[in-house]
Amino acid sequence: MYGVLAHYYSFISSPSVMVNFKHHNAVQLLCARTRDGTAGWERLTHHASYHANYGAYAVLMATSQRKSLVLHRYSAVTAVALQLMPVEMLRRLDQSDWVRGAWIVSETFPTSDPKGFWSDDDSPMGGSED
């Protein structure tokens, strides 16, 4: 999409272990239910305790009492800053009631994993909460 290439992966951690958890697409990653308003998106950004921008690479960490989610994003958050998003999409964003950061992620993440991003050893939904 307009030169924006977004790769994603996350780590789910518990007090004893941090494991790689593969998500099939951005919707699975951000929200287990359909886009039914702001509530499903606010949970991710509301609990964000760390957010850093490194050029075209960004990190978001969402935490709760039980687990942490570390999300590495390439060109997702910086798409607006680098003016990589088309004007009509920016207009929709400005008129939206949705959480700005989550909206950008949902619009710029790929719907499937890039070829070769995961090794052959990775399972489609590997990992555990323990």
Swiss-Prot record:
Segments forming a coiled coil: none
GO terms for MF: ubiquitin-like ligase-substrate adaptor activity
Keyword Disulfide bond: no
Effect of R33A: Complete loss of host DDB1 binding
Keywords of this entry: Host-virus interaction, Inhibition of host innate immune response by virus, Inhibition of host interferon signaling pathway by virus, Inhibition of host STAT2 by virus, Interferon antiviral system evasion, Viral immunoevasion
GO cellular component entries: host cell nucleus
GO biological process, one term: symbiont-mediated suppression of host JAK-STAT cascade via inhibition of STAT2 activity
Described purpose of this protein according to its UniProt entry: Plays a role in the inhibition of host innate immunity by exploiting host DDB1-cullin RING ubiquitin ligases (CRLs). Mechanistically, recruits host DDB1 via a DCAF-like interaction motif to antagonize IFN signaling by STAT2 degradation.
Oligomeric form and interacting partners: Interacts with host DDB1; this interaction promotes STAT2 degradation.
Listed name of the protein: Protein UL145
Record organism: Human cytomegalovirus (strain Merlin)
